[in-house]
Swiss-Prot record:
Keyword annotations of the record: 4Fe-4S, Cytoplasm, Iron, Iron-sulfur, Metal-binding, Pyridine nucleotide biosynthesis, Transferase
Primary role: Catalyzes the condensation of iminoaspartate with dihydroxyacetone phosphate to form quinolinate.
Source taxon at top rank: Bacteria
Pfam hit, one: NadA
A biological process term (GO) from this entry: 'de novo' NAD biosynthetic process from L-aspartate
Name of protein: Quinolinate synthase
Binding site residues for iminosuccinate: H46, S63, Y141, V142, N143, S162, H256, P257, E258, T273
Cofactor note: Binds 1 [4Fe-4S] cluster per subunit.
Organism: Bacillus anthracis
Cofactor(s) this protein cannot do without: [4Fe-4S] cluster
InterPro entries: NadA, NadA_sf, Quinolinate_synth_A_type3
Residues holding [4Fe-4S] cluster: C110, C230, C320
Pathway membership, UniProt: Cofactor biosynthesis; NAD(+) biosynthesis; quinolinate from iminoaspartate: step 1/1
HAMAP family recorded: NadA_type3
Amino acid sequence: MSILEKVQPIETMLPERYYTMSTEDMEKRVREIKEKMGETLFIPGHHYQKDEVVQFSDAAGDSLQLAQVAASNKEAKYIVFCGVHFMAETADMLTTDEQVVILPDMRAGCSMADMADIEQTERAWEELTKLFGDTMIPLTYVNSTAAIKAFCGRNGGATVTSSNAKQMVSWAFTQKERLVFLPDQHLGRNTAYDLGIPLDKMAVWDPHTDSLEYDGDIEEIQVILWKGHCSVHQNFTVKNIENVRKNHPDMNIIVHPECCYEVVAASDYAGSTKYIIDMIESAPSGSKWAIGTEMNLVNRIIQQHPDKEIVSLNPFMCPCLTMNRIDLPHLLWALETIERGEEINVISVDKQVTEEAVLALNRMLERV
């Protein structure tokens, strides 16, 4: 047992017996419980999950899509969310009070979501208001905590996804002169630049120094980017692209917009997870692709398209480590606990936070 497991609250510790069970036995038990529970159990699985987990998901998709699908399954009393913490929070906020959302491993967080906590954000908003007055509107990527979504909700802002970021940023500028984009600076920068906003009219707020970083005239700043990033997509570099161009000049390069501006600019295509999946799906047989996104998804795409030559843009990439905490043993543990009439790792968002966060979510859903 690791030190991390020893210091966890007892309800989040995986019992020892799951470490000794065979994969075959665990898979058999998951199937038995799924069959027994029927429609009262719903298992959403994020695209970045391991195959050992995704094989049992009732729906696969991105975070918001899965939360919406979970909310539409009114028959399901238990939603065992195979993703990370902020995704389970969103599912809890969109489902009914009678439905129970469970995260198989409470350590499955998101480093990017954790880069913007509510205290830092409230402090930043206060300081930025001193500089810019009532000229700002906040937008947050759905990859953020419920508290940050709620902050945006009560301040007239909204959430965005990587698929609809352009639409939502365009909307934001019909509301206010300036935009504060949380927590992923890269998605914010790439989206704003794609809409014609020059880089020198963007600034970065550093929550650790409580300072605004910018190159141009402060009065001309239109976009304030939170200094956060995805730890996975940050690892794709221009050097990776140069190596592909040199060794495979006929290979298409497609990346997620959570990659930095320089990588997106040097790629052939950039878009959401769904965009990447659809692009490869519709590509002709024999086409060649280097993909800049999470490794579990890249490997799954490779398996699904043996007629195409597909590689990771960075050959030394690792999967998302926090997403990978959800594994077959933790999934089975969650299901067997439910089968016994018990509940572990329940995700429950405060009522007021939920109300304000849903405001932000609905402002997005009404416009896309």
